[in-house]
């Protein structure tokens, strides 16, 4: 089938890495990619084009219901819960009656507490929703208004990354928020890679590195780090550099795949990760722990997702 506008990937935690959900914000319906049956199914119940379902998370209770965060253009319930028991058809709106909200661009669920954290495009304060108390509160602020931020929490819940996918000022960075278990609170974000006022393509450490449109990322265990305080590398899409990068626990950014044959332009090319492979505006990425491979979702020739695009697989040759 035709794939357009891949925005975000999320594995169903009860599917043993067989069911991969994909959003296509602003372009079309969400999809279920069944990796076991090798089928793709349109899912209009998860939201339509105007509702712009963008991020998918899961509750941490025994039900592990689906949470869809929406980039609404008008005020409304920016987060909804779809029950697993209903086949993800029955919706519960998480709407804050005290504050008008629209335009979620990033969200995650803390793996230990189950609290939902999210950020809005037009305002700086970031929000949290407590499922137990049903309370909405702010907890920190990001750098500027009108920046599209993706959010990814570490598997341990000890910290989370903010990835600036878009800003009208054309700058890109990855920031980090540290979690205080005693206070049940995240710190204010601080930049660990890239620059708040610059964008580009440079492998390096911390502020010396340059990125240009970091989007979704995924933590993957590195066997070389066994026994270390942090055993995970962070793989992330870099849209305008048309590649996949790695951020190590020490803050070093390297290029994992893309920009084959020395090209700085986007394109479609399979082959060796660094010498041949090329991508076109990658936004989504997921790691399949069962099959030991990555899936990369691209926006295609036009980053708005209106052109036909593809989902690529990165795996060791058999």
Regions found by a protein language model. Name each.
Residues 216-220, 224, 229-248:
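Loop/turn-rich, solvent-exposed surfaces of beta-rich toroidal or solenoidal domains
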Residues 1-7, 26, 37-55, 71-74, ...:
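Gly/Pro-rich loop segments of beta-rich domains
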Residues 28-31, 76-81, 124-127, 172-175, ...:
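A short loop-to-beta-strand structural motif that recurs across blades of beta-propeller domains
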Residues 281-318:
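Blade-level signature of beta-propeller repeat domains, shared across WD40, Kelch, NHL, RCC1
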Residues 12, 19-27, 59-61, 68-74, ...:
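Conserved beta-strand positions in repeat-built beta-propeller and related beta-rich domains
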Residues 1-35:
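An edge-strand/N-cap motif at the start of beta-rich repeat modules
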Residues 11-17, 60-63, 109-113, 153-157, ...:
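Residue-level detector of Asp-centered blade-edge/turn motifs that repeat once per structural unit
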């Amino acid at each position: 089938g035709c794939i357009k506008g891949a925005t975000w990937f999320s594995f169903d935690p009860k599917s043993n890495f067989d069911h991969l959900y994909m959003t296509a914000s602003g372009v079309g319906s969400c999809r279920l990619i069944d990796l076991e049956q090798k089928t793709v199914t349109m899912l209009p119940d998860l939201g339509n084009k105007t509702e712009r379902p963008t991020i998918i998370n899961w509750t941490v209770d025994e039900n592990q219901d689906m949470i869809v965060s929406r980039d609404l253009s008008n005020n409304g319930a920016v987060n909804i819960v779809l029950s697993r028991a209903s086949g993800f058809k029955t919706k519960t709106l998480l709407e804050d009656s005290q504050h008008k909200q629209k335009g979620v661009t990033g969200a995650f669920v803390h793996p230990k507490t189950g609290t939902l954290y999210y950020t809005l495009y037009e305002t700086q304060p970031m929000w949290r929703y407590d499922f137990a108390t049903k309370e909405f509160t702010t907890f920190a602020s990001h750098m500027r208004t009108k920046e599209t931020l993706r959010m990814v929490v570490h598997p341990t819940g000890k910290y989370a990354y903010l990835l600036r996918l878009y800003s009208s000022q054309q700058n890109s960075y990855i920031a980090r928020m540290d979690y205080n278990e005693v206070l049940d609170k995240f710190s204010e974000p601080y930049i660990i890679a890239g620059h708040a006022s610059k964008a580009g393509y440079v492998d390096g450490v911390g502020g010396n590195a340059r990125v240009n449109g970091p989007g979704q990322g995924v933590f993957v265990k590195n066997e070389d780090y066994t026994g270390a305080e942090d055993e995970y590398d962070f793989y992330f899409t870099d849209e305008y550099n048309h590649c996949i990068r790695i951020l190590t626990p020490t803050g070093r950014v390297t290029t994992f795949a893309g920009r084959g044959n020395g090209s700085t332009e986007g394109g479609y090319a399979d082959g060796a990760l660094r010498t041949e492979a090329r991508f076109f505006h990658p936004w989504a990425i997921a790691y399949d722990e069962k099959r030991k491979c990555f899936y990369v979702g691209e926006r295609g020739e036009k980053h708005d997702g209106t052109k036909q695009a593809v989902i690529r697989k990165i795996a060791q040759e058999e």
